[in-house]
């Protein structure tokens, strides 16, 4: 609809979905072709918020000649957002999924890794263990976790922590692990650069297929066709 197009173009799609109490994982009628832009909306909202948080903390840290205010400030906001995510996911799971307040901690986890990583020193064996653990968790959550578990909440810790493990384990080039070298392959790097674009493009194609075939259960062949079309576009 025009209404949803305007909200998605203004990077407010997630707020519209909250207002409508949309269930992201609902099974039945095809979703809106603009629904997937909730993720881009939250990203833009976070990037608008981040300078407002980091700027004053950096100013104070520079004045004090210490990174403690920056570390402490980001950690506090991270903790508040995580607790909010736990509570909102438990009581209002549908709206919590799209709520930027409960998603901020996921982004700030990356900020905390960037802040603390210069002080993290690992030997190669420890780095290898952490990298394999990170990749194992990342694959496991996509296969083993029930689709009816509420998200984000504590469940979001698994992909966030696994990503942090992989980044931390590859911090020092001379101690790069097998996982780090594999993920540095130029084809995987290229795929990673395209991944979010594919993620956004596949959704309207998926919705079109669901409307065309009058079902939300498209099967493997049509599903792979959607992925290929998403890559080509």
Language-model regions, residue ranges each:
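Membrane-interface helix/loop caps of multi-pass membrane proteins
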Residues: 1-233
């Amino acid at each position: 609809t025009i209404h949803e197009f305007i909200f998605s173009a203004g990077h407010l799609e997630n707020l519209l979905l909250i207002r409508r109490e949309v269930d992201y994982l609902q099974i039945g009628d095809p979703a809106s072709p603009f629904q997937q832009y909730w993720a881009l909306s939250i990203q833009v909202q976070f990037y608008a918020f981040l300078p407002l948080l980091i700027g004053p903390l950096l100013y104070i840290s520079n004045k004090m000649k210490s990174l403690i205010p920056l570390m402490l400030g980001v950690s506090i906001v991270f903790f508040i957002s995580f607790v909010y995510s736990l509570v909102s996911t438990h009581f209002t799971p549908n709206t919590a999924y799209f709520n930027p307040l409960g998603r901020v901690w996921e982004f700030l986890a990356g900020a905390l890794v960037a802040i603390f990583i210069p002080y993290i020193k690992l030997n190669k064996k420890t780095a290898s263990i952490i990298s394999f653990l990170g990749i194992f968790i990342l694959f496991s959550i996509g296969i083993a976790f029930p689709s009816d578990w509420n998200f984000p909440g504590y469940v979001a810790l698994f992909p966030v922590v696994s990503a942090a493990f992989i980044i931390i384990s590859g911090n020092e080039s001379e101690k790069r692990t097998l996982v780090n070298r594999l993920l540095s392959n130029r084809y995987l790097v290229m795929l990673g650069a395209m991944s979010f674009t594919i993620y956004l493009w596949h959704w309207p194609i998926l919705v079109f297929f669901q409307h065309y075939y009058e079902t939300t259960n498209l099967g493997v062949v049509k599903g792979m066709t959607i992925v290929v079309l998403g890559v080509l576009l």
